[in-house]
Amino acid sequence: MTNRIGLFKKSWILGVAILVFQGCGTTKTLVFADKASVIAKINLINVVDDKVNVILDPAAFVADTVSFFIPKTVPGTYSDDNYGKYIEQFKALDYKGGELKVEKLDDNTWRIINAKDLDKIDYWVNDTYDTEVEVSDPVFSPSGTNILKGKNFMLNLHGFVGYFDGLEEIPYSLEISAPDGLEPVTSLVKGIQDVNRPETDIFVANRYFEVIDNPIMYSNPSTETFQVNDIAVTLSVYSPNGLFTAASLKAGMEKMMRGQKAFLGDINSTKHYTIILYLSNMDDNDAIGFGALEHHTSTVVVMPEQISKERLEEAIFDTVAHEFFHIVTPLTVHSNEIQYFDFNHPKMSMHLWMYEGTTEYFANLFQIQQGLITEEDFYQRLMEKIERSKTYDDRMSFIVMSKNILEEPYKKNYANVYEKGALINMALDINLRELSGGEKGVLWLMKELSKKYGDSKPFEDDKLIDEIIAMTYTEIGEFFNTNVIGNTPIDYDAYWKKVGLQTTEQEEATGYFFDGEVPYIDVDPANDNAIFVREGIQLNSFFNNLGAKGGDIIKSVDGKLTNLVNIRLLIGQSINWDSDKEIVMVVQRGDEEITLSGKVGVPTLDVVKLVPMEGAGEQQIKLREAWLKG
């Protein structure tokens, strides 16, 4: 996240804005490239070999060479995805239609020679969804692309449209030609429609960031719009087998977002918000990375289609709740590293504890404050986050991890931003409530920061924590220095005591392969549908007593090779297992094949519960009420 965007200063601006260019035997009037918009044309009608054609038409360059980029990474992904790998047949064309010399410098960069003669560039784009099971480092589906001729086009535009070096701040005009029957859903501003080209949609953006910040989905529309106070929300659903519609999900979504808006109060940075829901049929050429990617005024959510409505709604609501709260941070409150994001040489911010942690904390806190879940549900979520956070390095500085999140060993700890990141905010919230007599919490803090910073006013990355301390209490500085900047694990029991809670251990019954709807095993589509024991979760007594570990690949059970069919049968049979049944399970652990055996027993799970403390004092109960009820 560097300062290329917004800080590029042209050293060659001349006193005139118009040149007369001689070409093709005619006179062509051209504006300097830094004075006009880039026109990007995407053709969704003439799909060839699952690829679409893209043409970018800038104005005239005066430099001898110019570099063209497709993003290496984009905000919110915290990963190097190299979207340029999906670009093929790249050509730079002069005004006579001839090809200019192009040097490909890396996966995402093309240097165009004799750029003064450049008329346009022309290339083909392959999608990412149908490669997810083929590559070792697939693009996360919500930030990926889909080309399904005549049915669906998921246009995360960083996968289709690039930028010329130094021209990130000039306007873009997108001209997208689409088949009859497919309609676009996006928060991107529509331009003036050309009546002579009814098949072409025109969109406009003030700068390149606005292009990639506004995904578009073309599909046979299933769309609903509803009003949440002063925010117009659009929900669009693509369900390939027609199992779900926007209408079927609208009521629950509207209820949830009304709760979010009530929680946020006067924090608001948008008048419209678009939720794009893509449901995957789980074929080999479809999306398998489930989750969401946030944008300023929209979010892309990818989920499996073959689940119950209840489970889908639960997954969507938790996911969208998180993504919607990103309008607070980083979409409103953010650093220079995000405001001036460098898509190909990113400089990362040190504040993932806030960008993802605060957001995830709010996504859970608002539900208890708005009466959508019970206190017991909220406590259970916190305990689950503590349990999952233990699978990461608990002595890693969150500030150091965040600043270096694209590199190892920090990269493999990224998912902890949703676990310990949320818990950091919980501790900060309780500290603020305690020090302010219950009046101030993290929501108050974010409201204060949003008054000072906003969409076009970033903060300085290395000064934010000092600013927070100055706004609050010296004890908050001690907390940050110890548990966020420093590497000391959080003493959760101390925080439970502050609010009159305590932990207690209970043994609960589970299934052999499932705890309710939560599986202990999973399938790896990238490894011939291998069945493996899930990592990062607490295993039940069945797996623990056998000696199984997270990550073990189950090769066979009782002499029968495991595959998708056999494992389903085995799960069904396990319902009637006798506790004295002997079982032999062969697993692959790394390069070693290990035989595990023993009685199946009665499967149980040791669960740590968070419960009210007997004899809690009045101050503890008051602080708990302030924390949970706001």
Label every PLM stretch briefly.
Residues 363-364, 372-630:
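C-terminal recognition in membrane/secretory proteostasis and scaffolding
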Residues 2-13:
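Bacterial N-terminal signal peptides that target proteins for export
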Residues 80-89, 93-94, 99-258, 262-270, ...:
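Non-catalytic architectural context of zinc metalloproteases
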Residues 20-23:
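C-terminal motif of bacterial Sec signal peptides marking the signal peptidase cleavage site
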Residues 25-27:
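Bacterial signal peptide processing site
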Residues 29-73, 154-158:
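Early extracytoplasmic/domain-onset interaction patches
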Residues 56, 222-351:
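Juxtacatalytic substrate-recognition/specificity segment
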